[in-house]
Amino acid sequence: MDHLAPAFQDDCIVALATGAAPAGIAIVRLSGKRSLGLARRLAKLPEPMPARQAVLARLAHPESQQPLDEALVLFFQGPASFTGEDVVELQCHGGIKHVEQVLAAARCAGARVAEPGEFSRRAVRLGRLSLERAEALLDLVNAETDAALSAARSQLLGAVGRAVEELAASAQELRAEVEAALDFPDDAGEPPNRLAERALHLAARCQELLATHRVGRALREGARVVLAGAPNAGKSSLFNALAGEERAIVDEDPGTTRDCLEARVDLGGIACTLVDTAGLRGEGAGRVELRGMERARAELERAAVQVWVTDATAPLSGPQGDWLVVTNKCDLRPGGGGLEVSAKTGAGLDRLREAILERVRGTGQARASSGEVVITHRRHAELLASAAGAFARAAENAGRVPLEILGYDLAEGARALEQVVGRGVDDALLDTIFARFCIGK
């Protein structure tokens, strides 16, 4: 997988692999062919150093010999390590200043501070991780809900990669048969209708995977749900009820909410950002309230779901468009129309949560059990769409165009699928992907 590396260096890199906060234990990780030699400059280690066995050692600065810590040192000999290179982990005490000194000592010994995601990038380069599994590592760290964690874990364990590799192999097999027919035209090959069926099956399978992307993207990125409506419709009360805590000030006077408030909530496995906004009205608003209304309209433009909250004691009204219309205060006057809820009693809140979730995920389900294939990344979805288009063209043109063109379409589809797992991608894309990682990953 050397084609994945930018000007890849054989130097030794170092970074904190655990969180940058006070903790009982911190793990400082070194990777590179000189990592064990550098570790010996920091601590007296046995010769030979046993692999995968913890060795208790005293760390000291390589030049001043000032004692630093008593740590556990573990050596992972490449290629049987995370990066595929020799890796040394120093398990030391986790004070922030203390870890800074250990890292400084490692740099003094000859290590270079790792770039963001460089450990994972080296693992991809040396074939320890496929690209989509490396992406799943970041998703695993950032997951906010059980469902998002399950989707990330499934991808990390190879569910997406296996599905895509299987499709790519089938496409390459079909392409090889087309090329064999070109090389040996007198031999009886697959009839055009059979070639079309097989290409169409590949396209359909790509579309099946693509159909999971709407819910997959919501699992990974979350969704923005904005509550809007006239002043005093009960938006802030509803916001507090959905958030499960008193975040917004509630008062009988209209126009109490002047700015936008946010709360992160788990709705059926989707991490939703719930936004409370200033009431929207045409007349009577002061200067500050008008600014709040401007911010409310800006939030609505960003929303994945727009919820229009009305008051059950007032005539049912709502804007035109694809809004989820909710009638609040149904405890005061039931039968007001729309989706009836009461922020005060909690009536209808479960139905509201489900209605929001349906709009976020469409017909999919916000669940991803271990091994289930869910497409969470836009990059993967775009490549699957490209592959589906290429296979569909091949199916449509079978028997109508020269076999060379058919083979080209099949090859194009296979290449798109292979890029999902990292084959044939360029350095600029890798730079973009791994720049999102923290330094220790």
Q: Language-model segments: which ranges?
A:
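Switch I (G2) and immediately adjacent beta-strands of P-loop GTPase domains
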Residues: 56-77, 255-284, 305
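Conserved G/P- and acidic residue-centered "switch" motifs that form tight phosphate/ATP-binding loops
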Residues: 127, 232, 276
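Glycine-rich, N-terminal phosphate-binding loop of Rossmann-like dinucleotide-binding domains
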Residues: 30, 92-94, 242, 277, ...
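Switch II of P-loop NTPase G domains
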Residues: 75, 278-308, 312-318
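Generic enzyme active-site microenvironment
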Residues: 274, 309, 326
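C-terminal-of-GTPase-core extension/linker across diverse P-loop GTPases
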Residues: 2-20, 142, 146-266, 283-286, ...
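Short active-site oxyanion
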Residues: 24-27, 89, 305-306, 320-324
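A glycine-rich (often HGG/GG-containing) alpha/beta subdomain
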Residues: 1-150, 154, 158, 169
